């Protein structure tokens, strides 16, 4: 592993191997585009060509902070894990929605039903979000991996920065002033329960557990009114890590605001409330008038007394001082002016960003019309697409199949078609629909004998279920992946396929972007000639690409006629194959099969040889006790089940799956007397 630092760059790139294939020309092309000031570029990178590694090299060589946007949490977590491997010494941050569960408040007029907001916040992800904004304000070497959560409103960065507590050894400050500042930053005093976002006081010592920190707490030791020393310590064991000369404590929430801003906002809210009461009075709607008055006055009372209230985000326009209709502050406002943005799988992500505002607006309008919220609540919203375009820094769209928007906005298109491994795009075979099920059966048996895996994509849920049942009855180990399966189970299923617990995975629209399964040598597309979203040329190219990570990769399209979409997908795949084969011949490259360990999404690596033993490699080790009898086994299972549920809550899905296997192994081998 080589560690590279480029001139004038704060990043240290841990390079497992030098760029190869099309990577060097892609990196050089993107860097040239950035220095030429191109607003938009497209990296057209085929599956398995190492697009993430190219991004890492561009970031390291440009020396500029970066944000990488993905269209779902699973893909974001995968990118985050890879970026942390490339930049372990830099600030790689994860910014996604911190809700494990979220039910927004809504009103259904037809049933006169008001649904209260209900949510469960994931502590670990909240800490990572706060860490992201802190590092954007204090460091140059920052890489943020985010989902569309980045375009939703958070606190104003200017006021957030005003609310910090900066302490330095030798400063003169009274203990009560430090405590008052911490309370105004929404830190809780917890002398008994010392947790993230709290502080405790013991004589002349104040311990602060910063909201954005997961491993370190700050000890402020005072001598009379002077700061005698500052130490970082382990909040769990209490052992000192290091002495620091100065430290900045950031607020425990993005919505913390100075007292004078709260008072100014309250006056503005009162003014809007008066206008709304007058409106409902004129309209002769006493129920709505009483409702808006009661709800808003309660919130105002909380704001006066506590500085915050439930649903404070609905008053964000009053706090930020923005005019009606102006965009709310978002993570984009925290980005430095020289940042770079990468939009991964842009053909999906760009469309997703564009659709966020409308769904939110229709729900809010009902709440405003029926007196549950003031009209200003409509401005607590995600960015509209044209607003997002205005705040986009220099952007690189990353996709194997760029859509219309990227084609219209590409200052230049940089191709990354040749893979570092020498692997070429899969060979495409077309066969008739009439015999597709039985023909596929014989193909599956061939692959099973070679120890390879198969992906099958169907058009309907019903067909996927019937196909799964049929193959299962014939003794094939097959699973079915559908939209009702949650993220945890989806990751488990893909991991189990890679480990060989089953051989065939059947799906509808879930076998496309971001699935990295080198063991898959055959992708079968049933009813490929049925035009539509699932069989568009982009969908076909993405699905065919799932077999591109295997040296024996083949895609079989079952069709009775060649549609325009099929022709476009086949032509593009053939164009890429020709270029890849020619490059290999010119450079004497023999395609190499990818051998990739099954990784944990957030931390560590799961080794195939540990399957069934459930050992963890990495930070989050679960210590396995010595098991001598049935009582020990039952205790161990209870402990592991608790750890498994916690891992799932923290979105560490693959860790949860490892623990599940460990539980299963104990049950089979110890409780039920298996050999």
From Swiss-Prot:
Binding annotation for ATP: 45-52
Query: Which CDD domains does this one have?
Result: DEXHc_UvrB, SF2_C_UvrB
Q: What biological function has been recorded for the protein in this entry?
A: The UvrABC repair system catalyzes the recognition and processing of DNA lesions. A damage recognition complex composed of 2 UvrA and 2 UvrB subunits scans DNA for abnormalities. Upon binding of the UvrA(2)B(2) complex to a putative damaged site, the DNA wraps around one UvrB monomer. DNA wrap is dependent on ATP binding by UvrB and probably causes local melting of the DNA helix, facilitating insertion of UvrB beta-hairpin between the DNA strands. Then UvrB probes one DNA strand for the presence of a lesion.
- Location(s) in or outside the cell: Cytoplasm
Name the species this protein comes from. Neisseria meningitidis serogroup A / serotype 4A (strain DSM 15465 / Z2491)
Protein name per UniProt:
UvrABC system protein B
Q: Which residues form the UVR domain?
A: 634-669
Entry GO CC: cytoplasm; excinuclease repair complex
């Amino acid at each position: 592993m080589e560690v590279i630092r480029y001139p004038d760059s704060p990043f240290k790139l841990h390079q497992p191997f030098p760029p190869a294939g099309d990577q060097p020309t892609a990196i050089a092309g993107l860097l040239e585009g950035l220095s030429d000031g191109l607003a938009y570029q497209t990296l057209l990178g085929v599956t398995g060509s190492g697009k993430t590694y190219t991004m890492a090299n561009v970031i390291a060589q440009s020396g500029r902070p970066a944000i990488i946007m993905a269209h779902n949490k699973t893909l974001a977590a995968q990118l985050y894990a890879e970026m942390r491997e490339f930049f372990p010494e830099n600030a790689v941050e994860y910014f996604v929605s911190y809700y494990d569960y979220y039910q927004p408040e809504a009103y259904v007029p037809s049933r006169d039903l008001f649904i209260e907001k209900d949510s469960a916040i994931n502590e670990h992800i909240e800490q990572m979000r706060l860490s992201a904004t802190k590092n954007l304000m204090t460091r140059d070497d920052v890489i943020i991996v985010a989902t569309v959560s980045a375009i939703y409103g958070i606190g104003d960065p200017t006021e957030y920065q005003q609310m910090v507590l900066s302490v330095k050894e030798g400063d003169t400050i009274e203990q009560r002033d430090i405590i008052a500042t911490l309370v105004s930053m929404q830190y809780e005093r917890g002398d008994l329960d010392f947790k993230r976002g709290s502080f405790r006081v013991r004589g002349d010592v104040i311990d602060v557990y910063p909201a954005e920190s997961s491993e370190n707490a700050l000890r402020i030791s005072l001598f009379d009114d002077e700061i005698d020393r500052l130490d970082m310590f382990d909040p769990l064991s209490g052992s000192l890590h290091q002495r620091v000369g100065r430290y900045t404590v950031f607020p425990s929430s993005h919505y913390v605001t100075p007292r004078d801003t709260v008072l100014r906002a309250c006056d503005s809210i009162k003014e809007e409330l008066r206008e709304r009461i007058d409106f409902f009075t004129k309209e002769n709607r006493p129920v709505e008038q009483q409702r808006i008055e009661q709800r808003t006055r309660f919130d105002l009372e909380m704001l006066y007394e506590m500085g915050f209230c439930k649903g404070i985000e609905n008053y964000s326009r009053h706090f930020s001082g923005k005019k009606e209709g102006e965009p709310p502050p978002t993570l984009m406002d925290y980005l430095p002016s020289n940042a770079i943005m990468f939009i991964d799988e842009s053909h999906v992500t760009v469309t997703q960003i564009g659709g966020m505002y409308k769904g939110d607006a229709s729900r809010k309008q009902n709440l405003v019309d029926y007196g549950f919220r003031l009209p200003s609540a409509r401005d607590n919203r995600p960015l509209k697409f044209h607003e997002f375009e205005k705040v986009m820094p220099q952007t690189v769209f990353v996709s194997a199949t760029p859509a219309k928007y990227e084609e219209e906005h590409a200052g230049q298109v940089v191709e990354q078609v040749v893979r570092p491994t020498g692997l070429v795009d899969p060979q495409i075979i077309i066969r008739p629909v009439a015999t597709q099920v039985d023909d596929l059966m014989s193909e599956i048996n061939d692959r099973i004998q070679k120890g390879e895996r198969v992906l099958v994509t169907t058009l309907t849920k019903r067909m996927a279920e019937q196909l799964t049942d049929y193959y299962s009855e014939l003794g094939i180990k097959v699973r079915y992946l559908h939209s009702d399966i949650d993220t945890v189970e989806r990751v488990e299923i893909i991991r189990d396929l890679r480990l060989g617990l089953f051989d065939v995975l059947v799906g509808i629209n879930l076998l496309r972007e971001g699935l990295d399964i080198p063991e898959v040598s055959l992708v079968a597309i049933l009813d490929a000639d049925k035009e539509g979203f699932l069989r568009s040329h982009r969908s076909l190219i993405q699905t065919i690409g799932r077999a591109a990570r295997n040296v024996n990769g083949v895609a079989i399209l079952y069709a009775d006629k060649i549609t325009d979409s099929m022709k476009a997908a086949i032509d593009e795949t053939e164009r890429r194959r020709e270029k890849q084969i020619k490059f290999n011949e010119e450079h004497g490259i023999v395609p190499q099969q990818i051998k990739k360990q099954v990784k944990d999404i957030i931390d560590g690596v799961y080794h195939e040889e540990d399957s069934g033993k459930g050992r963890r490699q990495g930070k989050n080790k679960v210590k396995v006790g010595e098991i001598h009898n049935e009582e020990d086994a039952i205790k161990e299972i209870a402990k592991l089940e608790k750890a498994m549920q916690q891992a799932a809550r923290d979105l560490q899905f693959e860790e949860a799956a490892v623990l599940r296997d460990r539980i299963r192994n104990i049950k089979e081998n110890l409780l039920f007397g298996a050999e």
